[in-house]
């Protein structure tokens, strides 16, 4: 199989695990995929529901939960860890900022146009991928 290269990141196994929410793509799955050589992805969607004990405020609980999941994945994994943040989420900006602060390797954004995403990034801070279904299918076809 070909190595998957996205920016400076190189995944030995050309697999990007889907960021499936709510509560499916968390640190356990993402770290397992990363340890096998693929890109493990944590879904940022709905974490406020799973981490409601951390804060009564849904947005705050979601951001605290995302930070916790990224840290757990980092503890378990030696490979590439990313986050999937849907642009359509009302707390998109906060989730992106949390992902950057926690030093994820890559942010995937879909479900809208992430027009303000570049404003959150510093040079060489994190790789970002914006995707649509068509672009994702084209990328997969190129790998095969």
What are these regions (language model features)?
Residues 133-136, 140-144:
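Single conserved hydrophobic/aromatic residue that forms the stacking wall/gate
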Residues 65-68, 128-134:
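A general structural signal for short secondary-structure boundary/capping elements
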Residues 60-62, 127, 143:
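Short alpha-helix boundary/capping motifs
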Residues 1-104, 113-115:
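N-terminal capping/small domains of soluble enzymes
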Residues 14, 19, 127, 136-138:
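Proline-centered helix-kink/hinge sites
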Residues 40-43, 108, 126-131:
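Short hydrophobic/aromatic-enriched beta-strand-loop microsegments
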Residues 109-124:
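Active-site-adjacent beta->alpha loops and helix N-cap segments on the catalytic face
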Residues 78-83, 121-130:
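Short beta-strand/loop segments at the ligand-binding rim of alpha/beta enzyme cores
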